[in-house]
Regions:
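Non-catalytic positions within long, well-ordered alpha-helices that form the structural scaffold/packing
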Residues: 60-63, 161, 180
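Short acidic/polar active-site loop segments enriched in Thr and Asp
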Residues: 65-66, 166, 185
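Active-site/ligand-binding-proximal alpha/beta "capping" segment
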Residues: 129-166
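Zn-dependent metallopeptidase/amidohydrolase metal-coordination segment
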Residues: 170-189
């Protein structure tokens, strides 16, 4: 595979969160060209908020059709413990900043985009089938996105559960919105 440090790519920031390497890796996997981002920014880092557009548009321009994302998130269900895999079926955003705010580039998508089926049904079916073939338990749930960096209070956790969320985190939603805007088939675990 070819590895491109974010620092060598125009529009890609240096990352400050431990464990986020900051690399674009392109290689072959079972006959398919695969592009992988190692690392992401978070809104709480106060980094340029255009980064979710940059990564998803880069993926679109190099020919990607699918956008699969992973994250470390917290469970709001006692039945889903640490280390569990949860496939996201929808989200609630409390990030307080939509990454599509600002000038729109029609090359990547329309000014206004519907958010139904953001988590592409056929992609979710493939993820479920893959988990089953590997004998992995794959939970499903709604992701609640918060700004961070502080964790939630007990009262907030109760409120988020009441709103229908199963997992919570400080990332993912901005790039999901941008990937959907670009027409990529989104799946998140």
């Amino acid at each position: 595979p070819e590895v491109f440090p974010f620092s060598d790519l125009a529009g890609f920031p240096e990352l400050s969160v431990a464990g986020h390497g900051g690399e674009l890796i392109i290689g072959q996997l079972h006959g398919f060209t695969v592009a992988c981002m190692r690392g992401r920014t978070h809104y709480y880092e106060n980094i340029e908020h255009g980064f979710p557009k940059t990564i998803t548009r880069t993926m679109k321009l190099i020919g990607c059709q699918y956008f699969l994302s992973t994250n470390a998130s917290g469970s709001l269900r006692e039945s889903v413990g640490p280390g569990s895999l949860v496939m996201i079926t929808d989200h609630i955003s409390f990030n307080f900043n939509n990454p599509l705010v600002g000038p729109n580039d029609e090359e990547f998508g329309p000014r206004f985009i519907g958010m139904e089926n953001v988590y592409h049904p056929a992609t979710r079916d493939r993820l479920k089938a893959s988990a089953k073939s590997l004998d992995l338990t794959l939970h499903e749930g709604v992701y609640f996105g918060v700004l961070g960096p502080s964790f939630e209070t007990p009262a907030e956790i109760r409120a988020y559960r009441t709103l229908g969320a199963e997992v919570i985190g400080m990332s993912t939603i901005p790039e999901v919105i941008c990937a959907h805007h670009c027409g990529l088939h989104v799946g998140v675990i």
